[in-house]
């Protein structure tokens, strides 16, 4: 059965294109935020900043994982049958439930900030955790709104809301950090100030989405079809959301445990002072921030593929399923493979380009970033395969791999960080092993759905070949350029040249054709 065309909805590539553009802007803004903030706060201030975010990510993971996925999937299935009335009911019920959950989480973060800070043995991060409470509440409200639009395969509103958040974080976050850093609060205040910009951005983003939803609903025509009751909708909502949220919660909990384990092992196991351990954790966080940059570009593919694949799978459109699976893996690997290889090879110059005012942190973070480069590739496969399994209704399978990977990560972290010659480098190594195990498990779960998708293997091998050639080229030109100029200037030129070589190889290997590029750009303009 073929799906009917709907002009109001975007295809997978159109949706992914829109979100990729917004993600590029958001990440650029994030990079412009990270550079001054990290140079202002240094290792100590960034240690407070990242510790607060680990707490936030654990408590607010529901908002960014299971809940929007559940809303998107339910609305997508409902719209296949043309029942717009039920789509509206799903939104209203989800908004009511998510608002209550968000309020509870925000309350816990605000009044329990000092307790959380003590648990992770970073007492000075309490103020930053408290400021993030507003962001947590807004995140839950946004999950319902974004899930609604994503279920319609309309990504423009989500994209604009992300840009609003990014601009507020960049402008207000930097300004407030600068001001508070110069008060008696020093690094503690500077970290909290940077996070205040994030909270204001979340409020503005929610406001924009609510206004957009009201305007969009006015153009929706009632279907007059039967609608399920609230209890049935809530039951279905949590049936889908709980496994996905548990999976995301596992990784957030693992990251929180990592924070605690790393800080405790460095202090109690290796005998480092709190200041030294916090500095090392700040360096680790800086490298992880760069790892998150290319990894974030995989999210548009997972968000876009879920409603499209769900609709095709529900309609039993085998050709549509195969086509979208192939495209999803192809475009995700086009980004992840060169990014991962490039980061591994050019880790040192990348650290010095971004953290140019803190050379000690840049030098210490380079080996960490090099290992994270491998994790970029594995993360892409894990994320894409997990989203595909969710689209097919296999929401419990990714949870299994997440739990196994999470346990392995915790055990390896405790062991590797405790080795004096390895210490903080053990954290990214454990991350790589974790994602490698999850990759193998997810691909095994997906095997029976991959019939008719042989092009995925062919495309991946071509992309890997182009990426390796690019990596060798980058390695050969970076050293002499750095010797002639400087690590930063030589590295920057090497990155630009390597990107140009990769783009040329992609066309020469016929991984992507000029016709495909023009098609995507034309759809993006629409």
Where are these regions (language model features)?
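Interfacial/gating helices of multi-pass transporter permease domains
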Residues: 38-58, 187-192, 235-240, 263-291, ...
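Membrane-interface junctions at transmembrane-helix termini in multi-pass inner-membrane proteins
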Residues: 140-162, 374-404
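Signature of the first transmembrane helix
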Residues: 11-72, 106, 110, 135-136, ...
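Membrane-proximal transmembrane or re-entrant/amphipathic helices at the cytosolic face
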Residues: 2, 475-526
């Amino acid at each position: 059965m073929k799906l009917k065309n709907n002009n109001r909805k975007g295809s997978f590539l159109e949706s992914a294109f829109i979100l990729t553009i917004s993600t590029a802007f958001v990440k650029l803004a994030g990079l412009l935020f990270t550079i001054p903030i990290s140079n202002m706060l240094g290792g100590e201030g960034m240690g407070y900043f990242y510790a607060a975010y680990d707490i936030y990510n654990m408590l607010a993971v529901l908002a960014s994982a299971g809940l929007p996925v559940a809303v998107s999937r339910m609305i997508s299935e409902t719209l296949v049958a043309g029942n717009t009335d039920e789509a509206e009911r799903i939104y209203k019920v989800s908004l009511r439930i998510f608002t209550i959950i968000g309020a509870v989480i925000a309350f816990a973060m605000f009044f329990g900030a000092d307790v959380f800070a003590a648990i992770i043995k970073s007492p000075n991060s309490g103020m930053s955790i408290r400021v993030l409470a507003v962001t947590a509440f807004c995140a839950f409200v946004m999950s319902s709104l974004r899930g609604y639009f994503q279920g319609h395969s309309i990504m423009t509103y989500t994209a604009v809301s992300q840009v609003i958040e990014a601009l507020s974080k960049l402008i207000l976050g930097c300004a407030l950090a600068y001001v508070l850093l110069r008060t008696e609060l020093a690094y503690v205040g500077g970290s909290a100030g940077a996070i205040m910009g994030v909270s204001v951005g979340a409020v503005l983003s929610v406001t924009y989405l609510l206004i957009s939803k009201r305007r969009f609903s006015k153009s929706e025509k009632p279907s007059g079809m039967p609608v399920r009751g609230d209890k049935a909708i809530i039951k279905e909502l949590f049936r889908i959301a709980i496994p996905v949220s548990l999976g995301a919660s596992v990784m957030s909990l693992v990251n929180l445990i990592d924070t605690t384990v790393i800080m405790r092992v460095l202090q109690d196991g290796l005998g480092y002072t709190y200041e030294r351990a916090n500095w090392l954790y700040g360096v680790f966080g800086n490298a992880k921030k760069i790892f998150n940059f290319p990894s974030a570009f995989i999210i548009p593919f997972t968000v876009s593929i879920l409603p499209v694949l769900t609709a095709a799978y529900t309609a039993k459109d085998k050709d549509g399923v195969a086509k979208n699976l192939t495209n999803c893996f192809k475009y995700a690997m086009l980004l992840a493979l060169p990014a991962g290889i490039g980061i591994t090879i050019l880790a040192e110059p990348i650290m010095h380009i971004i953290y140019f005012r803190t050379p000690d942190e840049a030098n210490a973070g380079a080996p960490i970033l090099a290992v994270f480069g491998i994790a970029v590739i594995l993360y892409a496969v894990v994320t894409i395969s997990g989203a595909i399994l969710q689209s097919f209704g296999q929401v419990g399978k990714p949870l299994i791999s997440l739990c196994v990977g999470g346990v392995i990560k915790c055990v390896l972290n405790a062991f590797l960080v405790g080795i004096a010659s390895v210490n903080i480098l053990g954290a990214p190594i454990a991350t790589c092993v974790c994602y490698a195990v999850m990759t193998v498990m997810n691909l095994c779960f997906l095997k029976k759905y991959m019939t008719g998708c042989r092009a995925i293997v062919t495309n991946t091998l071509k992309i890997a070949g182009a990426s390796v050639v690019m990596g060798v080229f980058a390695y050969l030109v970076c050293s002499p350029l750095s010797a002639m100029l400087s690590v930063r200037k030589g590295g920057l030129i090497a990155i630009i040249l390597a990107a140009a070589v990769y783009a040329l190889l992609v066309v020469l290997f016929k991984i992507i054709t000029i016709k495909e590029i023009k098609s995507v750009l034309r759809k993006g303009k629409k």
